[in-house]
């Protein structure tokens, strides 16, 4: 059976390849000093008995849904959007970091960023940040 904690560690490892981030968290921190990335459970966090075409383990396949929060700067900073743009597209993007190893270090069968769900003001705890929320699907048996 897939190991949820190991998958989160694999995601964190891939995000740590992005230049410019001060830190990557696989749990929601009490305090974040941007630029950072945070891995949080998506909705629903886990789906069991998912099928993929040509899968021999269709009854065991699980889909793990995550949100990757990229917090570029405090919301009011003028340069925050330019920093954020590089994380949502281009060679230094979150998409390319995950695509660089879709097995997340061997913990998953496949992983893919499916969309940028939000771009703009992101509230984490009591702080407002210019950020983006990216949806990540991870498939594992």
Task: Say what each PLM segment does.
Residues 1-33, 43-141:
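Charged, amphipathic alpha-helical segments and their flanking helix caps
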Residues 35-39:
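A short glycine-rich, His/Asp/Glu-containing loop-to-beta-strand
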């Amino acid at each position: 059976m897939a190991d949820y904690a190991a998958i989160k560690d694999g995601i964190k490892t891939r995000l740590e390849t992005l230049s410019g981030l001060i830190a990557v968290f696989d749990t929601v921190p009490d305090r974040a000093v941007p630029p950072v990335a945070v891995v949080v459970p998506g909705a629903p966090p886990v789906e069991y008995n998912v099928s993929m075409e040509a899968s021999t383990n269709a009854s065991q396949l699980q889909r793990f849904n995550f949100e990757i929060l990229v917090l570029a700067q405090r919301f009011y900073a003028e340069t925050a959007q330019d920093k954020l743009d590089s994380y949502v597209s281009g060679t230094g993007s979150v998409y390319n970091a995950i695509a660089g190893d879709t097995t997340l270090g061997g913990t998953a069968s496949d992983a893919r960023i499916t969309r940028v769900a939000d771009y703009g003001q992101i509230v984490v705890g009591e702080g407002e940040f210019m950020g983006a929320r990216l949806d990540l699907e991870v498939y594992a048996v």
